[in-house]
């Protein structure tokens, strides 16, 4: 059990006399499982309207701030403010946890890096990793409040699209190790430059103590800017990873063997050789940082490297599925210029006679949108696509520049594309689906489920 009457009373500063034992904390009644704790938050909808639904699904208790007619009164925990109660629960978990906290941020690669680190650690330790990419303030609080007391390693990812957001979150999380995967043009709509994005990402170090450790991708944009910020914060325990021999951890070789890839890493002068099922290069570059963290923790990196084969892309983040006799690379969860380039390079790497790209808008790029979408044209050509489907207002910039030798179609939105859904998959093709989440390209895959 994650919560009981005693710990809830201590966290919330109230007396709970009835016997309560709960598992994970949920704010969406659709996610409630038997034994969970439902908290009625006020958002676009009032969580109090879904309390009965949560109880029907097996919630062991409900936290509410106004009266709701419930038959089993022993399940009720009444507070003044539900969101404040959630914050108190999260703070209680952090203050009473003996776990080492590893927190990851970056423009792209946060979730895949977090999941890889989880896989490599969970064979030998009790690991908690934040769910999915739920990486804003609410997500962090819900995840932290759902962490088991015996957790040895807690892994969180933090996202942001405005200055100050990460600073607020690390005041609660207090990371022992903080990692920046990279800095790229994601969220440029809300910033004036890459340097401003780097400054916002570096807020992950704002709550560091003298024993905390920074892990940085040396190949990223603004690397020297990050080092300057760390120096100003008097942070000296800095470890880098990347493609350079000057880093603490280096990806020496990535060799495509068809259905497998051969990888050679050097982690603090220890050379590792590993062959794993085929995965794009950009994933294996982030694994360099993951192996570096394993080494920093004093764990056996040779054993950890052998577990790399157990990592597979998560839903919507590069997984390959079969639809209508076509292999489909599902990478529709989000898109930035860097991740779009990586996805098209992935398409280029995978051997196939016929390749199709379904490209959706990259959102939140502001006045840079036209330039950054036009930049994708060369990557599409390099991937040798025979067909290209473009979805969204901004992809019109791509449509205008693609040569006529490529069979192409432009759609204003995914709903317009869906009227032609049966024409998309002709069989024996390799198809990439890539775009920002707001474009909703997942509808294409959901149609065939």
UniProtKB/Swiss-Prot annotation:
GO terms for molecular function: ATP binding; UDP-N-acetylmuramoyl-tripeptide-D-alanyl-D-alanine ligase activity; UDP-N-acetylmuramoylalanyl-D-glutamyl-2,6-diaminopimelate-D-alanyl-D-alanine ligase activity. One of its GO terms (cellular component) is cytoplasm. Pathway: Cell wall biogenesis; peptidoglycan biosynthesis. Keywords: ATP-binding, Cell cycle, Cell division, Cell shape, Cell wall biogenesis/degradation, Cytoplasm, Ligase, Nucleotide-binding, Peptidoglycan synthesis. The keyword Nucleotide-binding applies. InterPro entries: Mur-like_cat_sf, Mur_ligase_C, Mur_ligase_C_dom_sf, Mur_ligase_cen, Mur_ligase_N, MurCDEF_CellWall_CoF430Synth, MurE/MurF_N, UDP-N-AcMur_synth. It is found in: Cytoplasm. ATP binds at residues 106-112. The keyword Nucleotide-binding applies. Its main location: cytoplasm. It holds the Pfam family Mur_ligase_M. It catalyses: D-alanyl-D-alanine + UDP-N-acetyl-alpha-D-muramoyl-L-alanyl-gamma-D-glutamyl-meso-2,6-diaminopimelate + ATP = UDP-N-acetyl-alpha-D-muramoyl-L-alanyl-gamma-D-glutamyl-meso-2,6-diaminopimeloyl-D-alanyl-D-alanine + ADP + phosphate + H(+). GO terms for biological process: cell division; cell wall organization; peptidoglycan biosynthetic process; regulation of cell shape. Involved in cell wall formation. Catalyzes the final step in the synthesis of UDP-N-acetylmuramoyl-pentapeptide, the precursor of murein. Belongs to the MurCDEF family. MurF subfamily. This is UDP-N-acetylmuramoyl-tripeptide--D-alanyl-D-alanine ligase. It comes from Rickettsia montanensis.
């Amino acid at each position: 059990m994650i919560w009981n009457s005693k710990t809830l009373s201590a966290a919330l500063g109230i007396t709970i006399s009835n016997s309560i034992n709960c598992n994970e904390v949920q704010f969406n009644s659709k996610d409630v499982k038997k034994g969970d704790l439902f908290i009625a938050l006020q958002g676009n909808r009032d969580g109090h309207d879904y309390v009965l639904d949560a109880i029907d699904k097996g919630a062991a208790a409900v936290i509410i701030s106004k009266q709701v007619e419930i038959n089993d009164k022993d399940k009720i925990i009444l507070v003044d403010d539900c969101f404040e109660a959630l914050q108190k629960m999260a703070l209680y978990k952090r203050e009473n946890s003996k776990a080492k906290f590893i927190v990851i941020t970056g423009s792209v690669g946060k979730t895949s890096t977090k999941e890889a680190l989880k896989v490599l650690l969970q064979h030998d330790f009790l690991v908690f990793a934040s769910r999915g990419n739920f990486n804003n303030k609410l997500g962090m609080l819900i995840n932290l409040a759902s962490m088991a007391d015996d957790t040895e390693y807690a892994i969180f990812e933090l996202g942001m699209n405005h200055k100050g957001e990460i600073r607020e979150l690390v005041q609660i999380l207090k990371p022992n190790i903080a990692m920046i995967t990279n800095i790229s043009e994601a969220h440029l709509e809300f910033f004036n430059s890459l340097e401003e994005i780097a400054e916002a990402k570096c807020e992950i170090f704002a709550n560091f103590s003298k024993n905390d450790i920074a892990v940085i991708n040396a190949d990223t944009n603004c690397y020297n800017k990050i080092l300057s910020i760390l120096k100003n914060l008097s942070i000296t325990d800095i470890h880098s990873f990347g493609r350079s021999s000057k880093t603490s951890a280096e990806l020496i070789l990535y060799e495509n063997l068809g259905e497998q890839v051969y990888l050679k890493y050097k982690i603090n002068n220890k050379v590792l050789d590993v062959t794993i099922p085929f995965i794009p290069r950009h994933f294996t570059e982030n694994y360099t940082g993951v192996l570096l963290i394993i080494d920093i923790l004093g764990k056996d990196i040779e054993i950890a490297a052998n577990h790399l084969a157990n990592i597979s892309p998560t839903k919507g983040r590069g997984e390959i599925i079969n639809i209508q006799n076509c292999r489909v690379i599902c990478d529709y969860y989000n898109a930035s210029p860097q991740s779009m380039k990586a996805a098209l390079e992935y398409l280029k790497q995978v051997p196939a006679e016929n390749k199709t790209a379904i490209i959706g808008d990259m959102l939140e790029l502001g006045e840079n949108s036209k330039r950054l979408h036009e930049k994708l044209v060369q990557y599409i050509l390099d991937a040798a696509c025979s067909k290209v489907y473009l979805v969204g207002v901004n992809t019109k910039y791509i449509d205008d520049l693609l040569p006529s030798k490529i069979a192409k179609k432009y759609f204003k939105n995914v709903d317009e594309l869906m009227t032609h859904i049966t024409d998309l998959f002709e069989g024996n093709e390799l198809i990439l689906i890539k775009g920002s989440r707001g474009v909703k390209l997942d509808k294409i895959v959901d149609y065939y489920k």
